[in-house]
């Protein structure tokens, strides 16, 4: 099963990705990152550095200002970022 982190998890596209993943059996959202930490079926953090869950990929629909932090995290974890 593919474990996903969604950045921008509470935005419009984040909600679309959450909905798509919820209807699948081969992947799951393990964490989200968003300035709005509104409750979800998974933990949502304000920064990528706070995420403790193991994941296989980051799907990014966040603000471009967060790109440097996302690239640093992705490289440190050897995790694809799309």
Placement of each model-derived feature along the sequence:
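N-terminal Rossmann NAD(P)H-binding glycine-rich loop of SDR-like oxidoreductase domains
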Residues: 6-18
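Beta-loop-alpha module in the N-terminal Rossmann-like domain of NAD(P)-dependent dehydrogenases
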Residues: 58-74
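ADP-ribose/adenylate-binding Rossmann-like module
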Residues: 72-82
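Short amphipathic alpha-helix with an adjacent loop that forms part of the alpha/beta core around
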Residues: 43-54
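Structural motif
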Residues: 56-57, 80
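Extreme N-terminal starter segment of soluble prokaryotic enzymes
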Residues: 1-5
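NAD(P)-binding Rossmann-fold cofactor-contacting core
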Residues: 22-42
């Amino acid at each position: 099963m593919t474990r996903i982190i969604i950045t921008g998890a509470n935005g419009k596209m984040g909600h679309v990705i959450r909905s798509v993943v919820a209807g699948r059996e081969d992947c799951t959202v393990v964490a989200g990152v968003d300035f709005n930490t509104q409750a979800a079926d998974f933990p949502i953090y304000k920064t990528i550095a706070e995420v403790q869950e193991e994941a296989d990929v980051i799907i990014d629909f966040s603000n471009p200002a967060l790109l440097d932090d996302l690239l640093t995290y992705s490289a440190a974890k050897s995790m694809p970022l799309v």
